[in-house]
Amino acid sequence: DSDGKLHIYIDGKITTKNKRNNDDDRFTAEITFTSLDNVELTGVCKLETIGDFMTAKLKVDLSGASKMLVGGDFLAKEKLNIELSGASNLKGQMTSPESTFDISGASNLSLKGNTVHCKMEVSGASKANLEDFPINELKAEVSGAAKAHFQVKEKISLHTSGAAKATYSGDPIIL
């Protein structure tokens, strides 16, 4: 539309070949674009990217049972902001000097790449696997029954509560 946003949705009912909607029906849209700085997925949907992307700032907001698979290297030159809620899932390779993650519900985050400064909250029954995502400086809160695994190089501030479990590799200074 006129604000530079692409909205994809189903308006009304779609009848498939077998004349009824069922759980096996899938609808696919293939889109080619040159820039991407904001992704918002809600409900039961999936986004797969192919190739490398570069942007100044990237915001990803996944909710419901949405899924995003990054099939190349995604470079956010200034800031990366990821919010996952519900049973959402994000997997791929991302790089940014500054990253903020808010993972809640039963969501899953699995990243490769790296960041310099990272703030993270992992709660509920969520999982964050950042063992292949080196972080120079991490400030993290892990709560509920969440699980998080990090690779930290320089400094770490880590707080856990409830039945949460957090592990890290590296030899950072504990703040």
What is each residue range found by the language model?
Residues D1-S63, K67-E83, K91-E98, S110-K112, ...:
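Acidic (Asp/Glu) and glycine-rich low-complexity loops/linkers
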Residues K79, L90-L175:
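Short, surface-exposed interaction patches in beta-rich subdomains
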